[in-house]
């Protein structure tokens, strides 16, 4: 039993609030335990220079943490004049994940920017951002089709992500901050809706882990994202 009382294969309570932002084409406030992330998807007709006149679109992402999202105030990166390596890594992960589930040709010469702002951080912010961003992107695509800006749906898959780790020699699902900060192994799994993997990030924090332990984490992650896919579908089908 974990400090939170959860079983090793148990996710934290999850909720998805649709369209909390009135100006973005799509938005979602995802809450996974005490990790809360505001995700939005905004449409633009300007694409990166390397895509001009190619009739192909692009999806990019930005990620940030509000100053009050952590136990000690987190300084705004804009004030410091540069983004941290962690921020750049996470927003690139979100961007390439979303591009993997979109037919960029069908998107046309358009760009969608995914914005992920962490309101409260208690572990798993990047995986929550990916799971919430899919919902925001889905809503944005739906809005663009309703407005006849898009004639064909470019979404070709679903996506969700979850963290796993080895904590006190036991594989566990969906680590909170206390578990993450003391875990022997920390990993993130990003899955497409068809069961294929999009990305795996895994790091031994204290000691190397075995192939058997990796496969145990993979099994936990597959079961966890299945629950996330189900929740995404429930909220989107009920619109």
Curated annotation (Swiss-Prot):
Keyword RNA-binding (UniProt): yes
Query: Which PROSITE patterns does the record match to this protein?
Result: RIBONUCLEASE_PH
Q: Which catalysed reactions does the entry list for this protein? A: tRNA(n+1) + phosphate = tRNA(n) + a ribonucleoside 5'-diphosphate
Q: Which residues are phosphate-binding?
A: 86, 124-126
Q: What is its EC number?
A: 2.7.7.56
User: InterPro entries, alphabetically?
Assistant: ExoRNase_PH_dom1, ExoRNase_PH_dom2, ExoRNase_PH_dom2_sf, PNPase/RNase_PH_dom_sf, Ribosomal_Su5_D2-typ_SF, RNase_PH, RNase_PH_bac-type, RNase_PH_CS
Q: Which GO terms describe its molecular function?
A: 3'-5'-RNA exonuclease activity; tRNA binding; tRNA nucleotidyltransferase activity
Transmembrane residue ranges:
none
Q: Which UniProt keywords apply?
A: Nucleotidyltransferase, RNA-binding, rRNA processing, Transferase, tRNA processing, tRNA-binding
Question: Which biological process terms from the Gene Ontology are attached to this UniProt entry?
Answer: rRNA catabolic process; rRNA processing; tRNA processing
Quaternary data: Homohexameric ring arranged as a trimer of dimers.
Q: Which NCBIfam families match?
A: RNasePH (TIGR01966)
The protein's name is Ribonuclease PH
Organism, by scientific name, is: Rickettsia bellii (strain OSU 85-389)
